UniProtKB/Swiss-Prot annotation:
One of its GO terms (biological process) is sister chromatid cohesion. Its main location: cytoplasm. It is found in: Cytoplasm. It comes from Koribacter versatilis (strain Ellin345). Signal peptide: none annotated. It comes from the Bacteria. Required for chromosome condensation and partitioning. Residues 115-181 are annotated as: Disordered. This is Chromosome partition protein Smc. GO terms for molecular function: ATP binding; ATP hydrolysis activity; DNA binding. Contains large globular domains required for ATP hydrolysis at each terminus and a third globular domain forming a flexible SMC hinge near the middle of the molecule. These domains are separated by coiled-coil structures.
Length: 1308
């Protein structure tokens, strides 16, 4: 069995200093001392270190009351610490009996109680700071992770229950945070600092157990087992079943012996259960019941989730079946679509092949006609070539003339510039010479200033040396004065020590007054604290009332929210179905627009190909553009048709009338036209007409409009052709000069009017809208050409507008599809969120209801605490009145003591005058030294300023010298430049004479070339008329070829659209599809039937509505989750069943153990009762014998000669003996390592004290007894005695004495 070895206290109640009590291994130890000295604090310390959670049981209000609160001479400590050491004699390796404390009967001469007190306080503060919990460093955190068993989270005892009924269970007490706390606290955020401790783990020996408990004023608390941090539960586990557990019967505190009889039957049962060793089974049962409740709660949540997942799985199962049907029908539709597309591709390829064969024939015909036209173009080109040669020579001559004129202008400008520069150089040289003279004078003045500053620098250095010597002398004088002052102050300190000794005589009286005042102050603080706690409890009750109302509202609100969410979910599902139907319709519309867009793109490509390749032009023009010979600056701007736009109703009329003119090649210069003619004569066969753009400087004079050539009138029935044509890119009205037919052309409403006007105006051309052209006595007509350049471009513009419209509609449609997809996604997300909110609301409603019930229980506990605070307020008020009455007498004693102190102070002041004179002398010497130091610093600063000024002047001298050299160089360079410019002007005058003669010769040659050019142009116009007829036949063939090109382009566009459909629908390209040989190629009715079937399948797919293709995968995942939840549900059911079986087994074991212990203790109780009373009868009985598991225990006691029905009718002494008899019965059945009895013998008379002591001696053979007593008989029975004194007010001290050896020697 364990034995109590040692008890250490620090800062616990009145034991502010480190105090140690060493107990013998067995027998009896007595603790004695006067009332109020702190004897019972030792018993409280042992109860506290073993885990007592009730501040009331420790004679306090709050748990912080156990921390030393301070006195007049001592400040409060920062913590309370108690360590309890027990040993196992069979395994302990050290000494069981410690050496005695040496007690001396006299004080040493140098003993200083104040110094000893101060040293003790410092030691306590240092130790408190050392063990104070805090945030760990990185190295300490690593150490803590390496040894997790040595650390535990700090706990707070500020909120510990203050009554026995409110004591927290060990499972959630200090050192073991609850589940809610564990969910909030981050385990890595704040940890307990790993720190060095005075009780290191390596000091404990085998067979030794040391339990330590600490409580800090911050509210942090910790438990240690053999120096390692542990939990309260660990401490309870060690002592559970030994009589030292939570229901301890081994520690009988002052006044508690009678409570054993007056307590409730259920409380007495707890003592018997502790003795029977079933407390640990009770704890296990309580934990098992808690686990059972948690498992049931988890099962309820799992059942809810299981039901929800089951419903979700059934829904997904239906969606998965629909998705399977959809996928099957979609695969059939795609297979049918593959056959249809492959057949259509084959038909399109065959039709394109036929058109390309016809296109080849038409191309050969065009080549034949082109050769015929080419011969005539060659003849026309020879005539044009001479005109180009003349134009080139004229151009070169004009360029030479322009170059000469530019050179003459530049030479004149250069000569004027040189003359101005020469005048500027003369003025600059004069200014530079003047600046050189001024700078030379400045250099002389700077050299004089430099010499003066050097003399000042030498003088400043000498002054600094003298000031340093004077400073050293005055510093020595100041040091001597300070030494004299120090000697006198030492003598004065000796006098002050004498006064201090006199003050100590008065301090004893003042201490008593201060203690009384402090007690009143403490009572005031306690009154304020209790008032605050009362107010806090009142506010807490009010707050709980508000919270209860709030929780009720939250519960109702949660239910209302769940109902509202159900309605919103129904609406969201309806909106989602509608949006999905709109999305299907929008996608169908987008597919139609894409097909139309592909057709328009094909048509646009065909038209652009014909226009870009100039398919409407002559072969010569086409080959000229295709050859690429005209590059860089000679690139053609296009043909004349590119510069004209005509109203739609006049397009065919203008195209037939200006058939040849529209093919004119527009170039930017005559050089480009010459290069084109060269190509037509060489690499490119054929003829062409070139039109020079008005931007050319030579051609612009040919485009001046002669208004005199116009008809004198414009009939109202006639529309001038120029009004129907809009000319682009710089031609404007000047195009009428180049094309006389344009200025003389008119459009009439019918042929009769045209014929009549043609006879009246033989120079004009009159065109009817039916295609006839009347000129003088000729008329031209016939079938109109199908398409010309103007109509092709107009058609291209129409196609481009259609493409823009379709693109806009397609973008809108795609945006609509995207918007609907986004809305569907948002609605899906909203639906999911609403369902999540609904589930969360259901959980919140459940949580609110549970919290509401907890709050009502908490309100009941707060009401009980409120009543306790009211009773405590009354007690504090009564004690304060008693203390105030005692202060009056103490103040009279204090006045006499202070008078003596004032006499000693007067003597001290008389000796202070000489000390003031020495201080004045020291201050004067220090002041003189400071002035000398300041003067030396000023002279040093003057020396530094002189050196800096000298350096600045030397820098200026260098700069001025450099400036003089630079100015002389500028004067020399100006003279050289003036001479060079005068020589250049003479050369320019000679060149001007030569350039004047060259310009006159060039002007004469230009006039000759202009005359010859006009003659050549007239001949070219005659040749062009002959080409007109041949080109008309060629244009008809080209029209047919254009139609064939358009047909091929249309078929290719259809093929591209189907290829895009193939990729989008089948995810396969056209070549890959055509490579599949096993696909049948349908034609005619078979193809139409297959196409209809695949469209019907597509319609069925669309009619199926939205299909969740992810349902298959979601169904699998939900099924797996369903299976997992089912497994979890089964595990919880098994856990609940196992826990219930465990509780039943615990109930059976505890019943057997209790019955056995009850019978044995009852028998021992009866024997001890008879022994203490000398007869009589005492026994226990169950209040409910039919239900022994939960029955309370009643005590029946009948002393000799009495027959009592209630133990409460016994006297105080009889109650004590009866209760002690019960304790003896318990100890005889289940002895505890030690037993503490606090003034249990107080109510007993001398006879009963003797009996009591005799029984204690008998029991001390097995159990170690610690008796706190005032009885001399009891003291005599103890071989070891501890005396508790309070020499210093409010501070308890311990003195121990062993009597056993002295008694043995006396007997010998």
């Amino acid at each position: 069995m364990l034995k109590l070895k040692k008890l250490q206290l620090l800062g616990f109640k009145s034991f502010c200093d480190r105090t140690e009590l060493k107990f013998p291994g067995d027998g009896i130890a007595a603790i004695v001392g006067p009332n109020g000295c702190g004897k019972s604090n030792i018993a409280d310390a042992i109860s506290w270190v073993l885990g007592e959670q009730s501040a009331k049981s420790l004679r306090g209000i709050h748990m912080q009351d156990v921390i030393f609160a301070g006195t007049r001479d001592r400040k409060p400590t920062g913590m309370a610490e108690v360590s309890l050491t027990l040993i196992d004699p069979e395994q302990y390796e050290g000494k069981i009996v410690e050496p005695e404390i040496e007690i001396r009967d006299e004080m040493p001469d140098d003993w200083d109680e104040a110094a000893a007190r101060e040293a003790s306080m410092e030691e306590v503060d240092e130790y408190t700071a050392e063990v104070q919990p805090g945030t760990n460093t990185e190295a300490e955190a690593t150490e803590q992770q390496a040894a997790p068993s040595e650390g535990a989270a700090p706990t707070t005892e500020a909120t510990a229950p203050s009554t026995e009924n409110e004591a927290a269970p060990s499972e959630v007490a200090e050192g073991q945070p609850s589940d809610a706390q564990a969910a909030v606290i981050n385990p890595n955020a704040v940890v307990l600092k790993i720190r060095r401790r005075k009780f290191n783990t390596n000091r404990f020996k085998k067979g030794e157990i040391c339990v330590t408990r600490r409580l800090f004023r911050s509210g942090d608390s910790e438990y240690l087992l053999n120096g390692k941090l542990s939990r309260l539960r660990d401490v309870h586990d060690i002592f559970m079943g030994t009589g030292l557990g939570p229901e301890s019967y081994a520690i009988i505190e002052q006044g508690r012996i009678g409570q054993i009889l007056s307590s409730k039957p259920t409380d007495r049962r707890a003592i018997i259960e502790e003795a029977a060793g079933i407390t640990k089974y009770k704890t296990k049962k309580r934990l098992a019941e808690a686990r059972l409740e948690d498992a049931k709660s988890n099962l309820a949540r799992v059942n809810d989730i299981f039901d929800e997942v089951t419903r979700q799985m059934n829904s997904l199962k239906r969606q998965a079946a629909k998705a399977e049907r959809y996928a099957k029908l979609r695969d059939e539709m795609r297979e049918k679509l593959r056959v249809v597309l492959a057949s259509k591709f084959a038909l399109i390829d065959a039709e394109i092949a036929g058109l390309e064969a016809e296109l080849t024939t038409v191309t050969e015909e065009i080549a034949t006609r082109t050769d015929a036209v080419q011969q005539m173009d060659n003849e026309h080109g020879e005539r044009v070539q001479r005109g180009y040669a003349i134009d080139a020579e004229a151009k070169q001559n004009r360029e030479s003339l322009n170059n000469v004129s530019r050179e003459m202008d530049r030479a004149a400008q250069r000569r004027r510039t040189n003359e101005e520069r020469c005048a500027e150089l003369v003025a600059r040289s004069a200014g530079a010479e003047a600046e050189i003279q001024n700078t030379t004078e400045q250099l002389g003045r700077l050299e004089e200033e430099l010499a003066t500053n050097r003399q000042v620098l030498e003088s400043a250095a000498a002054d600094v040396a003298v000031a340093q010597s004077d400073l050293q002398t005055k510093q020595q004088e100041a040091s001597a004065a300070a030494a004299n002052l120090m000697n006198v102050e030492r003598e004065q300190e000796q006098r002050r020590s004498q006064i201090f000794q006199a003050v100590n005589a008065a301090s004893n009286v003042r201490n008593r007054i201060t203690q009384a005042e402090e007690r009143i102050a403490n009572l005031d603080r306690e009154h304020g604290r209790v008032t605050g706690e009362l107010s806090s409890a009142t506010l807490q009750l009010e707050s709980f009332g508000g919270q209860r109302g709030q929780l009720g509202l939250e519960f109702e609100s949660a239910n209302t929210r769940v109902n509202a969410l159900s309605s919103e979910i129904t609406d969201a599902r309806g909106s989602l179905q509608q949006k999905r139907q709109e999305e299907i319709e929008a996608k169908r519309h987008v597919d139609t627009l894409r097909a139309e867009y592909a057709t328009l793109l094909g048509k646009k490509g065909s038209l652009e190909s014909v226009i870009n390749e100039h398919g409407y032009s002559t072969e010569s023009v086409k080959r000229l553009f295709q050859s690429g010979g005209l590059r860089e600056g000679n690139t053609p701007a296009g043909v004349l048709a590119d510069f004209l736009e005509v109203e739609d109703k006049y397009e065919h009329v203008v195209e037939d009338f200006l058939r040849d003119e529209l093919n004119y090649v527009v170039v930017k210069s005559w050089g480009a036209a010459d290069e084109g003619l060269r190509l037509l004569k060489g690499d490119v066969d054929g003829r062409a007409t070139f039109l020079v753009h008005p931007s050319d400087s030579q051609a612009k004079f040919s485009f001046v409009l002669d208004e005199s050539m116009r008809l004198p009138f414009t009939p109202d029935r006639v529309t001038p052709m120029k009004n129907c044509i809009r000319v682009l890119n710089g031609f404007g009205k000047s195009l009428e000069v180049v094309l006389p037919k344009l200025g003389n052309g008119y459009i009439v409403p019918d042929p009769a009017i045209g014929r009549e006007l043609a006879l009246e105006n033989p120079d004009a051309f009159f065109l009817s809208q039916s295609g006839e052209c009347f000129h003088n006595v000729t008329v031209t007509g016939g079938k109109q050409r199908s398409q010309g350049p103007l109509s092709l471009k107009r058609e291209l513009r129409d196609v481009m507008r259609c493409i823009d419209d379709v693109e806009r509609s397609l973008r809108d449609g795609e945006a609509r599809v995207l918007m609907l997809g986004k809305e569907i996604a948002e609605l899906t997300s909203l639906l999911q969120r609403l369902e999540d909110e609904k589930r969360e609301g259901e959980k919140q409603a459940m949580t609110s209801g549970h919290t509401l019930r907890q709050l009502e229980n908490e309100m009941a506990r707060v009401r009980d605490r409120h009543a306790t605070y009211e009773r405590e307020l009354q007690r504090v008020s009564n004690e304060k009145s008693e203390r105030e009455n005692a202060i009056g007498g103490l103040r009279m004693e204090l006045e006499a003591a202070e008078a003596r102190h004032q006499e000693l102070e007067a003597a001290m002041n008389a000796a202070t005058q000489s000390l003031d004179e020495l201080r004045t002398a020291r201050d004067n010497a220090s002041h003189a030294a400071s002035e000398a130091r300041a003067q030396a610093a000023a002279l040093e600063e003057r020396h530094r300023a002189a050196a800096s000024s000298l350096q600045r002047i030397e820098s200026m001298v260098q700069e001025v010298s450099a400036r003089i050299g630079k100015l002389k160089g500028q004067v020399e360079s100006a003279a050289a430049e003036k001479q060079q410019r005068e020589s250049e002007n003479e050369t320019i005058a000679e060149q001007l004479v030569t350039w004047t003669a060259e310009r006159e010769a060039a002007e004469a040659r230009d006039r000759e070339l202009q005359t010859e050019s006009e003659q050549v142009r007239a001949r070219i116009a005659e040749i062009e008329e002959e080409l007109k007829t041949a080109r008309q036949a060629l244009d008809a063939a080209r029209d047919r070829r254009g139609e064939l090109h358009a047909s091929v382009a249309r078929l290719q566009s259809d093929g591209e659209h189907m290829a895009e459909t193939c990729v989008q629908e089948l995810s396969v390209t056209r070549p890959d599809l055509m490579a599949i040989e096993e696909l049948p190629r349908l034609t005619g009715d078979e193809l139409a039937v297959a196409d209809t079937e695949q469209k019907d399948m597509r319609t069925k797919l669309e009619n199926m509505g939205p299909v969740n293709m992810m349902a298959l995968e979601e169904y699998k995942e939900t099924a797996q989750r369903h299976e997992f939840l089912e497994t979890q549900r089964k595990d919880l059911l098994d856990s609940i069943e196992n826990t219930q079986n465990t509780i039943k087994e615990i109930d059976q074991i505890t019943k057997v153990k209790f019955d056995e212990a009850f019978a044995a203790i009852n028998e021992n109780f009866g024997k001890a009762f008879k022994k203490l009373f000398g007869g009589g009868q005492g026994f226990m009985k169950l209040t409910d014998e039919l239900n022994s598991s939960d029955s309370g225990i009643d005590v029946i006691a009948s002393p000799p000669g009495k027959k009592l029905q209630n133990v409460l009718l016994l006297s105080g002494g009889e109650k004590t003996l009866t209760a002690f008899s019960l304790l003896v019965g318990i100890f005889q059945y289940a002895p505890s390592p030690f037993c503490i009895l606090d003034e249990v013998d107080a109510p007993l008379d001398e006879t009963n004290v003797a009996r009591f002591n005799e029984l204690v001696k008998e029991m001390s053979m097995q159990t170690q007894f610690i008796l706190i007593t005032h009885s001399k008989r009891t003291m005599a029975t103890a071989p070891v005695m501890y005396g508790v004194t309070m020499q210093e007010p409010g501070v308890s001290k311990i003195v121990s004495v062993r009597f056993g050896e002295e008694a043995a020697r006396a007997t010998a």
